[in-house]
Amino acid sequence: MTDIVWHQHSIDQAARGAQKSQNPVLLWFTGLSGAGKSTLAGALERALFDAGFHTYLLDGDNVRHGLCKDLGFSLSDRDENLRRVGEVAKLMVDAGLVVLSAFISPTRAERDRVRALFPEGRFIEVHVSTPLSVCEARDPKGLYVKARSGEIKEFTGISSPYEAPTAAELTIDTSRGDLATQVQAMLAYLTAIEVIDANKLSALA
């Protein structure tokens, strides 16, 4: 038995979203290191922000400077990292925001656990499916070189598995096409499911 109960607010998620002329959701970008998750999420956020939508981007590196700075990279710490991010994202969605997150999140169980925090339609999984060979060739942080040499243990895609989504709402391979086209495809999807109003995008154009 616990004395902790939910405090019901007079203003709900729908009201907060309506005030901002948007339907709040979480877009969860998942994929290998170097796949282009942060680039895609950042470009989409910029397009949404410029059109007048209310957004926030949670990035895998950034949260480790504060929210998760006490965590390492063991399997249990990585799991806790994503648990915290999922809970923070839920609060932000409840606040009426369109939230974007960019995390490798290598297992289906981790991603499904975050999905379970949200009502149907409020969690959008974006699989950034860029092939390992392309990600390794990019290697923007030099992590693949360290993983191949054994300097980094349990590195996703090399010495630790990545479980690709089986039913992602969106799949984007950043080695095909250009960033602007990919952003437009994501905006079209968000418009189709009525997360955002096409009229606001038209006004921006």
Curated annotation (Swiss-Prot):
The active site is at 105 (phosphoserine intermediate). It catalyses: adenosine 5'-phosphosulfate + ATP = 3'-phosphoadenylyl sulfate + ADP + H(+). GO terms for biological process: hydrogen sulfide biosynthetic process; sulfate assimilation. Disulfide bonds: none annotated. Its EC number is 2.7.1.25. It is an enzyme of class 2 (transferase). Keywords: ATP-binding, Kinase, Nucleotide-binding, Phosphoprotein, Transferase. InterPro entries: APS_kinase, P-loop_NTPase. ATP binds at residues 31-38. Catalyzes the synthesis of activated sulfate. Belongs to the APS kinase family. HAMAP family: Adenylyl_sulf_kinase. This is Adenylyl-sulfate kinase. It comes from Shewanella denitrificans (strain OS217 / ATCC BAA-1090 / DSM 15013). The lineage of its organism: Bacteria, Pseudomonadati, Pseudomonadota, Gammaproteobacteria, Alteromonadales. The gene is cysC.
